[in-house]
Each structure stands twice: as structure tokens, then as C-alpha cells.
């Protein structure tokens, strides 16, 4: 029976940081990742059928984008070595200090994490878009803030992207991959610089995007950590005398693997970690003393999207980094609603979907595509669209649990989400209304998507909570360092532990919390 000192489940912003730092401390680290290891030449195109992940048949379909549908809420998740960094929009920003003043363990405050925010920014090579590389969307954002008399709220956001100061869109073949300049990062990995090709969310072909496999995970492997792709963990059980046994489905070999570890770190993301622990407590009964707070306190982080159209303005949403700038209303000055407006971009894959009215049927059925196609009925050119995006600080109104399947009502083994939209309504509606105001002042045309206006449906790529950190077992699932109450040496370190909405992109916060957790390691 294989035994290691530290077993990490998942390789996103929590798992990657922990793998790196614990390997540096000399631990024998093994990382089990459900998805594949992706290279630029493997990245999906609109013609491919297998780039989506299917949780019901992962042996057959193990692409890197996992869409989950939970009634009124849909969640987009990453699947692959690097986790959510494979599909996120590069934004690497710290929340305002007041976020940590309520609902967090006493040990966690902004000052506690300040140095960890700095270190994670260095590891991710965080930069901002050079002034001469502003996209039409960036300029529209600046104009909108200015016309509302709120220029002070506008800012270019920090991104985990490498930019070439000599690049500009006036170059011949400016968007050609050949314009990318290669360089070697601190972990010895070859990367390129951004050529504004617009495919950040679905795979940077020049490796300008600083995904975790190029930094934290690369460093972990340098220090002896082993990453095993296509290993889907199904259960964890404690061992007599200490440690844990983990059962994983090896999707490549189509075989079961059992591994024992002194310490186990669950880092499968908000949905993945919560589901795994729910199954261990309620389905397999291997971790029966997990807190009753498990699954509760989940939030979509208030993500919202409004497509706007400018008939006389070329905005080229499929060019440039996916998100470049923000207009910050996190101070609550808009009637108490707190939100962070961003310019959105759409990768060429989704752009092609819309241009051709949805030739990829599974993606065409997603709520994002439905919202976009709703506004294509008058055949307004895709290049004239502004995807207003953003996050809002909603109240956690979600609870994950295991429910019944209609065809097997005697079993409770299907992950369900009970989500109360009323706890998100004030913040999300404030963001939605702001999108309309920004559109109007800049001469565009937009309506709040019917999916929200009529049905109160949302989609989020930034799920948070489910294994919330707290000071007591009654309040949460893990303590300030991510250790699970009642189960020594079992940890959760990822977005599942964040006990509330941040109101902006969460990757930097998750990385900083993981840096903090690793620093507590003994």
C-alpha cells in the first residue's frame, strides 16, 4: 500500500500553493488531479466535442470546462492540472480590508494576509495592461466612469499575464502568435508575451497567461512533488493510529487507486471539495463527525453579465485580455449595494459560436450563450458588443446537500444546491442597473438579461464557500488554517473555505489564504 506524507486533492489556487510550499519544506507530496495536463497544442476549438467535462462520465469526457446546473444557478469549473487558473480571466486583485472585518475567524484579517497577497502576486508575475495597449473596451470603461463623474472609481486591474512593452496593435499582424516574445520564468518554464488574441478563458496559445502549471506547480515538481492527472478522488477515510486512506478512480487506467497519507489537503474547489466531504459524511459514512455547517454559506460571488450593443462603435470583445479594467463601487455608495464592474471579453471560441448561431449544441444551451443570443436577433455584429461583467458582494444564500435522483428515489447521492436569490438580489440588481447606466451614458443599447429579470437565474465562474472557515465547529467546517474540525491533519484549502462573497475576482485571495495556511504548517 502506497503511503506519502502529504496528499493533495486538486491543483487549483489552493492545491498548487500548498504543493509548492510543502514540497519546499521537504514533505513527500502527491497531487491527485481529476483532469488532464494540458498543453497549448491541446487547447479546445469550437469544432471539438470533448473539451467539456462530464461528471457523470469522466472516463469518456474529461475536457477542461465543467458546467454544473443547479436549477436557478449554474457554475463553471476548471478541470485539469492548474484547476481554475485554466479558465479564469487572469484578474489577480486583493479585496478591500473591510471584507475581512465580519464573518471570518478572528485570526484572519487583511493585515494577516498582506504579505501573502504580495508573495502570491510575485509568484503569478502580476502586471497591468500598458497604457498604449488599452483595448476599445478599456477606453469605453474609462469614458463611462468619466461621464458619470466617477473617474476616480476607474482602474486598470492587475492581471497574471506577461505583457511586451513594445507590442501595439498598429504592428503588422499584431495579433499573430509570432508577435509573442518568448522568455523563461523563474521556475525555468518557457512562456510568451500577450498578443491580445483574446483566448484567455479557453487557453492562451502563447503561454502569456500565468497559469499555475507554469509557476506554483512547476516549483512544486522541482522540489519533488508528484502530480498525477486523471485521478478522480471519491472518498477519504481515517485510519486507526492516524492518517487517512484515499480512494481515487484512475480515469486513464480505468482502475481504483488507494493511497495512504499522514496528512490530506482537499483542494478541489468550492463545489468539488464540498461535494467530496458531503459524500464522505452522508453517503459513504467515512467522516461522520464533519460539521453540520458543511454545504452551507455558499455564494456565487455575485457574478453578473450584461451584453450591450453599440451600432456605431467597434469594440472587438474577442481581442485583448478578457478583462482589463474595473469601476469600483465596493464602498457601498450605491444605496448599500457593493460591486465591482469589469469589462468582459469573449474568446474566439464563443465568438465563433455566436457568429454561427450555435453550432456547438451543448455550449449553445448554456445560459451565457442564451443571454448573448437573445440580443443577436437583430443581427447586430458581434464586434459591436460590449460584455459588461462584474461581481457583487451578495449574502451567502446557498446550501449544498445530497439529494435524490428521480429514477432512484431511495438513494441520496446527487449533489443539489438550494439557493435563495433574495439574499443576492440587492447586490446583483445594483450591479445590473449600473451596467444599464454605463451603457446609456456611452450611447449603447442594453437590457438586463431575461434569465435574471424574469427567472432570477445566474451563472458564476467564482463559486465560494461550502466548507467555510470559522472559529468553531458550529459556525463552520475548518479553522483559520484550513484544518477540519474533529479530523486532525485533514485540511481544506481552496475557495470552499471562503466564508462570504468578496465582490471581486477571488483567485488572489484564495492563493493568499493558501500561503497563510502553508506558513502555519508544522
Walk through the language-model features, giving the residues of each.
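Beta1/beta-strand and adjacent pyrophosphate-binding region of the FAD-binding site
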Residues: 1-14, 266
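Residue-level detector of alpha-helix initiation sites
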Residues: 12-13, 271, 422, 497
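Glycine-rich loop(s) and the adjacent beta-strand/alpha-helix scaffold that form part
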Residues: 24, 28, 35-45, 206-209, ...
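Redox-cofactor-proximal catalytic regions of oxidoreductases
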Residues: 50-132
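A glycine-rich dinucleotide-binding beta-alpha-beta segment and adjacent secondary-structure elements
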Residues: 62, 197-200, 238, 414-500
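FAD cofactor-binding and catalytic pocket of flavoenzymes
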Residues: 63, 69, 106, 291-413, ...
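Glycine-rich phosphate/pyrophosphate-binding beta-alpha loops
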Residues: 80, 84, 495-507
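Conserved redox-cofactor binding core of oxidoreductases
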Residues: 110-230, 454-459
